[in-house]
Structures are given as C-alpha cells and as structure tokens.
C-alpha cells in the first residue's frame, strides 16, 4: 500500500515501471 500500484505478499513496489 504505497505510491504506485503493484503490491504483492506484503512487499510494495513503487510506480509501475
């Protein structure tokens, strides 16, 4: 649940690059 979209198994990913 951070900037951008692409969360997975707790780990978060910034803006969808």
UniProtKB/Swiss-Prot annotation:
Secreted as UniProt keyword: yes
GO biological process: neuropeptide signaling pathway
Alphabetized GO MF terms: neuropeptide hormone activity
Domain of life: Eukaryota
PROSITE patterns: PYROKININ
PTM annotation (Leucine amide): residues: 17
Tagged with keyword Secreted: yes
Family in the record: Belongs to the pyrokinin family.
Protein name (database record): Pyrokinin-5
Organism: Therea petiveriana (Domino cockroach)
Taxonomic placement: Eukaryota, Metazoa, Ecdysozoa, Arthropoda, Hexapoda
């Amino acid at each position: 649940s951070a900037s951008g979209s692409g969360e997975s198994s707790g780990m978060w990913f910034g803006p969808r690059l």
